From Swiss-Prot:
Source species, domain of life: Bacteria
Name the UniProt record assigns to this protein: Large ribosomal subunit protein bL20
Gene3D superfamilies xref list: 6.10.160.10, Ribosomal protein L20
NCBIfam families the record matches: rplT_bact
PANTHER family for the chain: 39S RIBOSOMAL PROTEIN L20
GO BP: ribosomal large subunit assembly; translation
Record keywords: Ribonucleoprotein, Ribosomal protein, RNA-binding, rRNA-binding
Classification via InterPro entries: Ribosomal_bL20 (IPR005813), RIBOSOMAL_L20_CS (IPR049946), Ribosomal_protein_bL20_C (IPR035566)
């Protein structure tokens, strides 16, 4: 059986991992073994956090809406319930934007929600 020399393939694989680990601290960017583990772990974190980002933004929007609603004398849950009863279909992202940048429009929405309760 013929001998298989893997030098080229191994070098390419190592280069690929070390390129992905560029900018990491210390041995994580220089030593293949350590860099490989760091790149794998980074991928796991990235996968997990792409999902967490959606949750965290929703939490942020809800916190902002709650704060603005309470300034207008209504809790978050009652405000959302009032909007649903008034058949106002605005998503939380837009509501949070309105709460931060257009307080007058948000106050009008709160009044609409109050009247629907």
């Amino acid at each position: 059986m013929a001998r298989v020399k893997r030098g080229v393939i191994a070098r390419a694989r190592h280069k690929k991992i070390l390129k992905a680990a560029k900018g990491y601290y210390g041995a994580r960017s220089r030593v293949y073994r350590v860099a490989f583990q760091a790149v794998i772990k980074a991928g796991q974190y990235a996968y997990r956090d792409r999902r967490q980002r959606k949750r965290q933004f929703r939490q942020l929007w809800i916190a902002r809406i709650n704060a603005a609603a309470r300034q207008n004398g209504l809790s978050y849950s009652k405000f959302i319930n009032g909007l649903k009863k008034a058949s106002v279909e605005i998503d939380r992202k837009t509501l949070a934007d309105i709460a931060v940048f257009d307080k007058v429009a948000f106050a009008a929405l709160v009044e609409k929600a109050k009247s629907a309760l």
